[in-house]
Amino acid sequence: MIYEICANSYESAKNAEAAGATRIELCSELGVGGITPSYGLIKKVMDELSIGNCVLIRPRSGDFTYSEEEFDVMLRDIVLCRELGCQGVVTGVLLHDNTIDVERTAKLKEAAGTMEFIYHRAFDCTPDPIVAIKTLKKLGVDRILSSGGKKSAIEGLPLLKELQRIGNGKPMIMPGGGINAESIVQIKAAGFVPSKVAVRMVTCIPCGITHCP
């Protein structure tokens, strides 16, 4: 089982490493669902810790439809993460109808280079998750974080299992949302090897999903 922890500070990243977590999703401002952490925080974690570090790329709170200027910031942040040697980036971009923004997602993935490219729970806002996973599969996304469209991954297990079947490991489906020591047993029983464990859950995005992106 792979354990990933949302870390919103150097201290929480250090604690996650000490507790034996496999990797972290580094972000700031969990109170609004997480936004891109500062360059200084990313560099300190990369310089001083050995835990795998996937960085959230989200320029602001709110929805996942971004202006040209916001998108440019996202591209620049991804390049910085690549230059610092981060394991991956966690991001997501939607069109105004909440479908996957194919063109921009492709550009973000290209900017990521050889880093892992993880599509976050913006996925759970899409109107048709089956179409969405097929789209992301064509784009070569490595992982998708999802609660199966529900407030918790346990509630969303039926859809998560179907997504896992369609993805067939590429992209890998990572259950996220409301996961704790008890629910991990159910997640494993459903056939999922990796599972995202977020230390705090918040509600921030328009579709009302309780999450850490």
Question: Model segments located where?
Answer:
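Hydrophobic, well-structured mid-protein blocks that either form specific transmembrane helices
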Residues: 85-140
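Hydrophobic faces of well-ordered beta-strands that scaffold small-molecule active sites
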Residues: 3-7, 24-26, 53-57, 89-91, ...
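Residues at the C-terminal ends
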Residues: 18, 47-48, 83, 110, ...
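Glycine-rich phosphate-binding active-site loops on the catalytic face of alpha/beta enzymes
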Residues: 22-35, 80-96, 141-155, 190-213
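N-terminal pre-domain/capping segments
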Residues: 1-24, 29-36
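Alpha-helix-loop-beta-strand connector modules within alpha/beta enzyme cores
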Residues: 34-61, 100-122, 155-181, 213
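Active-site mouth loops of central-metabolism enzymes
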Residues: 1-9, 57-75, 94, 117-129
